[in-house]
Amino acid sequence: LLDDGNLQFLVKETTAKTIVCEVVIGGPLKSRKGVSAPDAKLTLSAITDKDRDDIEFALSKNCDYIAMSFVRHADDIRELRWLMKHLGKDAAVIAKIEMREALENIEEIIEVCEGIMVARGDLGVETPAEEVPFHQKRIISLCNGAGKPVITATQMLESMTQNPRPTRAEASDVYNAIIDGTDAVMLSAESASGAYPVRAVEVMSNIAHIAEEHLQESSSDYAEPIAKDNDHSNPTQYISNAISKATFDISKVIQPKAIVTTTLSGYTTRHVAKERPRTPILCMTPNEITQRRMALVWGVIP
């Protein structure tokens, strides 16, 4: 399957360097499109030689996040961390969830990375398209509970690559992802190669503002995240969870203009944000890297 499943080939013959295929579903194939083999268990390294060059370049420019494609399990993230340590640099890791194997290991992946991207293009090829909404909601819920930022991406406003207005279904898609608790929504082809890149950003931003206003006006609290607050095996985490929950409860009573957090790594701020308070969270930190990374977290003004 190529280009998010738009083209379908049947492999007839392979050699060490070539693959001969029969075209089942044809169409135009642009450059740099992905290739998927659903249900295949890959034994290749998660990091290719080109990936290594790209990672080294990104780290040399002091990037804040590195998004890792085709993550299968937590060891893929650990391999990336080892490489960054070997290069003498560091960046936060966003794991792109786009393979069936990643869904099977999603909780351990969330535990070892700094954030998750629901990459629905390849995910909708690796799994039936009708299952993608379930996987998206589950991943968002798990990330909310763990206090890890989650990005919902791919084909959110796909029609705006050619049209100045989104479809009603696309507007609903963006809105519902935000209502479900995603920290960020992302454009791909709409802004990278589409005919209306600025307009697409404006539309997505407007939908986000409307969704957030409706959440603020709602008489009910945000959905309670699935958090492991009762885990006494990690005293530091348990105490942080308790303080964050207490902060949230107090904010509901006194309704302050803002919640101010002080943090070095961003840990405290993320744990307050995972409670989804209606009050803006001001993140105070002496660490410039933490300040930039916190821009991705829900409700936080770094």
What is each PLM-predicted segment?
Residues L1-P302:
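Non-catalytic helical/linker scaffolds that mediate oligomerization, partner binding
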